[in-house]
Amino acid sequence: MDREQSVQHFLDLLKKSRRGNFKIYIGMIAGVGKSYRMLSDAHQLLESGIDVKIGYIETHGRVETEALVEGLPVIPRRKIFYKGKEIEEMDLQSILSPEVVIVDELAHTNVEGSKNEKRWQDVMDILDAGISVITAVNIQHIEGLNEMVQDVVGIEVKERIPDIVLEQADEVVNIDLTADELLARLKAGKIYKPDKIQTALNNFFKAEHILQLRELALKEVALRVEKKVESTIPENLGVRHERFMACISSNEKTPR
């Protein structure tokens, strides 16, 4: 499914349910383009006449992502003073009127005193209010994959979302890049600032780690799609779960 078809499918879902529809972009690691893709979707929805607003977006200073924020309505963040510092959080109470809201950093832990402890709980409230949500999360923040990711990279990630959050999604989409493409983006300064690049290369961004994380992300999304098929298509239709393998030679003279 290409991007235009994906957005159209989401538009179709909007018309079918009173509860907001829920779309999650999954990434194997930071920098694959989840926020960029959400903002691209938002522009297409806006052009289609859908009332879409940004509830919370984290650009991480990435120029390409910041450029896409331009032209999109943004709900101002709530400012809270906590331990002597001003902290900005998503303003849940102000997200009342749009049809669709963009909410980044799904696994985020809210500052003390917020209505909910976790942002994914905010998202559940938004959905229950009849507002659709497009959000994003990396696989290391998914509870069911947390230990496997820790085995791969040797780092325990504290902020997590329960698997049931994914099970409630109407769409789960994997944002994929090859290891070479991702490392090229990192080294070009498109993911982290220069002083953080080497640390990233020594941890999550080792080539062998990326390959294993990519496999985990692909398997997770495939599992969610399979479960969605099983829960929505009647058994009497006799759906077959096919598996295909394509072998493509690197020799340009080989017939394709």
Where are these regions (language model features)?
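Short, glycine-rich nucleotide/cofactor-binding loops
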Residues: 26-35, 111-114, 238-256
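Substrate-engagement module of ASCE P-loop NTPases
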Residues: 118-138, 160-161
